[in-house]
């Protein structure tokens, strides 16, 4: 396999795009490689400008539960496009999508559509602070909630990948109201409550940006109880896990009903769409009813709404979808772990529905400190081997992988075989 055209494209991109990419992890810096420049995707496969094809376990970082260029979703988007790209005015489809989202999630009375996960979490926090009339926020080490200033404190994902605990350009005044607790640690969390005037707590119930690290059930239930004790608004960030791990996101596994929740990725089916929502008494503080301001030129744009609605309709029609995706994820993670064991390579794997992760680590990972103990050099070697064998994995050990509906057992078994070859070559120093 060669990447000559991609190398040339990347060099050209770096002349006019900061870093050559429009989101940092895409640069492949942590795996010491050159990112393939993608020409197209179809089903479970990506095709690059060098005529290589890959089994794609990234799926645009999660949105494409039905894979690339799904015919039904694609046709509906094209039909919507013929009517106009954006109106800046209400449409019936927005109401229909809102109803579909609300019907899947307990405790959700109303939603507001936005264009990105960052907008959703930023707006939810503003709303929660207004409702609680308290300024301080608790977040958790390794949880990533977008790149708004107050949340870039000990975030996972790109910040972890590049070894920076935060970001330059964020004034101390922006982050001084952000308290950071240890994931899956109630004692650490309550200490934060005691330190500040906490108005809200935001958490990924299934963390996907320090690798895949699910919350322990007793921790999430305890967190809900602490929020009630200290009269703080609980925000579940399900931008990644919503409609991915299950139809009801994390609620399938934990049964926790938050005050506010954020969704993204799957609800836009690959187009820019996210939302936040919750109890009516909180949501009604939003302008134009209340005095909490939030707005967006392209919020609820008809193309993204149409794509998301098409995906949700397909999901709800397919009664065995999540069962099949979960089975494939289990087949993959168990196969990878068995292969690594054959070569005495320490590897921890897990999945939550169609989300999966693996760490080159001796022990199970429960928090950010555990994740940071992973062998990132081994990950980089493995990633590069797999890429050149036609398997496209997330290019950071602090990211999550995804199964999509077009994938088959044969694709999974081929991936495991390629992993076996890769481990063999790594051990032999080839």
UniProtKB/Swiss-Prot annotation:
EC number(s) from the headed UniProt entry: 5.4.3.8
PTM-bearing positions, type N6-(pyridoxal phosphate)lysine: 265
Keywords assigned by UniProt, alphabetized: Cytoplasm, Isomerase, Porphyrin biosynthesis, Pyridoxal phosphate
Pfam families per UniProt: Aminotran_3 (PF00202)
Catalytic activity: (S)-4-amino-5-oxopentanoate = 5-aminolevulinate
SUPFAM superfamilies, alphabetized: PLP-dependent transferases
Cellular component, GO annotation: cytoplasm
Compartments reported by the entry: Cytoplasm
GO terms of molecular function: glutamate-1-semialdehyde 2,1-aminomutase activity; pyridoxal phosphate binding; transaminase activity
Necessary cofactors: pyridoxal 5'-phosphate
Chief subcellular location: cytoplasm
Enzyme class: isomerase
Pathway: Porphyrin-containing compound metabolism; protoporphyrin-IX biosynthesis; 5-aminolevulinate from L-glutamyl-tRNA(Glu): step 2/2
Origin: domain of life: Bacteria
Record-annotated disulphide pairs: none
GO biological process, one term: protoporphyrinogen IX biosynthetic process
UniProt family annotation: Belongs to the class-III pyridoxal-phosphate-dependent aminotransferase family. HemL subfamily.
Subunit structure: Homodimer.
Protein name listed in UniProt: Glutamate-1-semialdehyde 2,1-aminomutase
């Amino acid at each position: 396999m060669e990447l000559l055209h991609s190398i040339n494209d990347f060099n050209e991109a770096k002349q006019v795009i900061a870093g050559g990419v429009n989101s940092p992890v895409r640069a492949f810096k942590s795996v010491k490689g050159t990112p393939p420049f993608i020409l197209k995707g179809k089903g479970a496969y990506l095709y690059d400008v060098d005529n290589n094809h890959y089994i794609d376990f990234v799926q645009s970082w999660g949105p494409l539960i039905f894979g690339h260029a799904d015919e039904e979703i694609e046709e509906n988007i094209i039909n919507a496009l013929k009517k106009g790209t954006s109106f800046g005015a209400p449409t019936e489809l927005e109401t229909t999508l809102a109803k579909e989202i609300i019907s899947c999630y307990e405790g959700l009375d109303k939603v507001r559509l936005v264009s990105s996960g960052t907008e959703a979490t930023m707006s939810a926090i503003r709303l929660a602070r207004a409702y609680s009339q308290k300024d301080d926020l608790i977040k958790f080490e390794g949880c990533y909630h977008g790149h708004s200033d107050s949340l870039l404190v000990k975030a996972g994902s790109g910040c972890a990948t590049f070894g920076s605990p935060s970001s330059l350009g964020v004034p101390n005044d922006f982050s001084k109201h952000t308290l950071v607790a240890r994931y899956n640690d109630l004692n650490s969390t309550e200490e934060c409550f005691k330190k500040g005037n906490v108005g809200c707590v935001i958490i990924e119930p299934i963390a996907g940006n320090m690798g895949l690290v699910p919350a322990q059930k007793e921790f999430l239930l305890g967190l809900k109880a602490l929020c009630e004790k200290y009269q703080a608004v609980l925000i579940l960030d399900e931008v990644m896990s919503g409609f991915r791990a299950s139809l009801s996101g994390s609620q399938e596994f934990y049964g926790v009903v938050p005050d506010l929740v954020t969704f993204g990725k799957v609800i836009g089916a690959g187009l820019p769409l996210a939302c936040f929502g919750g109890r009516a008494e909180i949501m009604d503080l939003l302008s134009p009813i209340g005095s909490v301001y939030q707005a967006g030129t392209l919020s609820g744009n008809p193309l993204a709404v149409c794509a998301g609605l098409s995906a949700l309709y397909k999901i709800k029609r397919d009664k065995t979808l999540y069962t099949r995706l979960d089975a494939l994820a289990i087949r993959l993670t168990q196969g990878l772990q068995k292969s690594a064991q054959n070569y005495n390579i320490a590897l921890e794997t897990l999945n939550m529905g169609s989300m999966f992760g693996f760490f080159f680590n001796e022990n199970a990972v429960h928090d950010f400190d555990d994740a940071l103990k992973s062998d990132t050099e081994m990950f980089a070697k493995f990633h590069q081997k797999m890429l050149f064998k036609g398997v496209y994995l997330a290019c950071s050990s602090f990211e999550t992988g995804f199964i999509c509906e077009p994938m088959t057992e044969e694709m999974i078994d081929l991936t495991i075989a390629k992993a076996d070859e890769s481990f063999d070559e790594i051990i032999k120093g080839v």
